[in-house]
Amino acid sequence: ETLKRFFPEAKVFTTDMNPRLAPAAYVSDGCFEVLRVTDPNYIQQILKLCKDNEIGMIIPTIDTELLVLAENKKLFDDNNIFVSVTSLDFIRVCRDKRNTGEFFEKHGIRVPKPIDKKHPTFPLFAKPYDGSLSTNLHYIKNEEELTTEILEDPKLLFMEYIDKEVYKEYTVDMYYGKDNKVKCIVPRERIKIRAGEINKGLTEKEPLTQYLYDRLETIEGCVGCICIQVF
């Protein structure tokens, strides 16, 4: 509705592997069936759809699309199609939680302390460095729960457990312009979670808005929306 208000002739198209089951397909101006994002022909298919339908901008909405679109951004630029995606380097920071922790510490934001899995202290928390949707997460209260399977998982990071009964948990949406400067910060308390996504929340301005603005006013290579979870 906002787009139509400023650009009455504009159209919004969507894509999905199964348009018949995609809610956005029923409200957009058209929905195209596409390959899985990992398919080697995905990019060429998206490029052809853009050319055939005079689409000038691509806005990805799930994190699995970001890397492949960033890797092919020049291809779309050469065809006068703008991809609203951050730089490849910053996406690598976000997609690998080992890099994410270093990024936050560099900007003066504390992260959970790492724990040596060979000499653990309890309780602890383990999660994959490339995980999403709250999969393969482990809250471990004692040595008996620290199984061999968990210890031998090469993707798991081990860290101190942050108790949600003690600390409030927030999801913060931040929007960055083409100048890599933040334009909007919206913190929401995570009251109820489903599959890693906030299902019920409460928007609160302070104290996070100023705290994050002071530390993340500018992020090199960051364009569009990012999402941060903090306690």
Question: Each PLM stretch: what is its role?
Answer:
Residues 20-28, 117-122, 148-152:
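Short loop/helix-cap segments at secondary-structure boundaries that form the rim of catalytic
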Residues 34, 61, 117, 188, ...:
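Conserved residues at the C-terminal ends of beta-strands
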Residues 77, 81, 88-113:
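Glycine-/Pro-rich loop/turn segments that contact NAD(P) or position catalytic residues
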Residues 1-84:
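ATP-binding N-terminal substructure of ATP-dependent carboxylate-amine bond-forming enzymes
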Residues 141-222, 231:
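Phosphate-binding site of ATP-dependent enzymes
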